[in-house]
Amino acid sequence: MKKLWGGRFQKTPEKWVDEFGASIHFDKTLVKEDIAGSLAHASMLEKCGILTEAEAVKIKEGLTSLLHKAEKNELDFSVDCEDIHLNLEKMLIDEIGPLGGKLHTARSRNDQVATDMHLYLKGHTEHIIELITAFQHVLIEKAEEHVETILPGYTHLQRAQPISFAHHLLAYFWMLERDKERYHDSFKRINKSPLGCGALAGTTFPIDREYSADLLGFDSIYENSLDGVSDRDFILEFLSASSILMMHLSRFSEEIILWCSQEFKFIELDDTYATGSSMMPQKKNPDMAELIRGKTGRVYGDLIGLLTIMKGLPLAYNKDLQEDKEGMFDTVKTVEGSLEIFAGMIKTMTVNKNMMKKATEQDFSNATELADYLAKKGMPFREAHEVVGRLVFTCIEKGIYLSGLPFEEFKKASGLFEEDVYIVLDPHHAVEKRMSEGGTGFKKVTEAIQKAKQCLNNF
């Protein structure tokens, strides 16, 4: 088959070269974006007098016909045409005749593919922000149900201090809020048009880049044609924001996996988000959480892969950039799927309040309350820390917890202890009294929920 770029060549590539060099098996994902870019380009060419009105109408009718076929999955792509751009150009020529070849006037595949990817990430970045917001609503709803549900807070995966479960959930709310901020910021660079930059140096035709950018909904255009066709920072920023988001989801997944284990029993996942074992009939595995934790690694790989591709490329376009798309598509699919699944998983999970509370009563996570108790009575905190540490050791030797220690032992450790020490040791009391800004006190958590709601309302 004769290549659309084949005029300079005396030989056609061998079949294996076509197979190796073709990108149509993955960049066909950009079919709608490519047609949208072509429709805008045709309108711009007409406005600038490069196409007649009749020519532009016929070209746009042909493109619209291809778009309808694409929506019905009726387009038959060929490796012989290499990529989405040449496939659609050939289809347009087949549809309306040689006039279809005029569409590529004042345009290169270099600015064409860059435009496609900007359009693709524009839509998906907006969608991801919407999915994050939906997940945040789920977290708020669940937090409202569990303001006074108490569980151990952990450091080093060791029980540290009792906290409100709502407080724990809100920690992820604010992580997701930062993720949204990162996507919003990256969107500024995504929302720029490279269309009209040509192969690298612009064009001799009197085009109007601002006009085509406006038709496509871009806020601005690239100021430098070399930069416009070779820039992939906007993809790297998207992949970076996605990597951080997936890291947050992976951390949450790890906790979900722990919490629904027999060792914790803090939650139970809905059957929809778990699977069984082919051998062990009793198993209920948190597969969705495990998959999200695992897929985080592949998103990291997509980012590192593109960074590695870009690090040695001279200006402007190089064929290496054909490899910029699969990781982008993969990350979009992974992030969108992970957010949808996680929101449903949290919304439908059952919280075992009794097991959470029981965990705070069978540990030493109230030891800090005891040290604070002494410090408030005038003892230097470092000395109080030492006194309570010795009491914890005494309890370990006796096989009891601080709340079960006889009052005489407290008095022996320090004369500052009074009978009210047992109130201080109650986990509910310990959580309730943590009223510093951003703390886990019930009133502060209730206020924090309102702040989170206001944050979403402002969005």
Curated annotation (Swiss-Prot):
Recorded GO CC terms: cytosol
Keyword flag Lyase: yes
Single biological process term from Gene Ontology: arginine biosynthetic process via ornithine
Pathway: Amino-acid biosynthesis; L-arginine biosynthesis; L-arginine from L-ornithine and carbamoyl phosphate: step 3/3
Keyword terms, alphabetized: Amino-acid biosynthesis, Arginine biosynthesis, Cytoplasm, Lyase
Gene Ontology MF, one: argininosuccinate lyase activity
Reaction catalysed by this enzyme: 2-(N(omega)-L-arginino)succinate = fumarate + L-arginine
SUPFAM superfamilies xref list: L-aspartase-like
Disulfide bond entries: none
Family per similarity comment: Belongs to the lyase 1 family. Argininosuccinate lyase subfamily.
Protein name in the entry: Argininosuccinate lyase
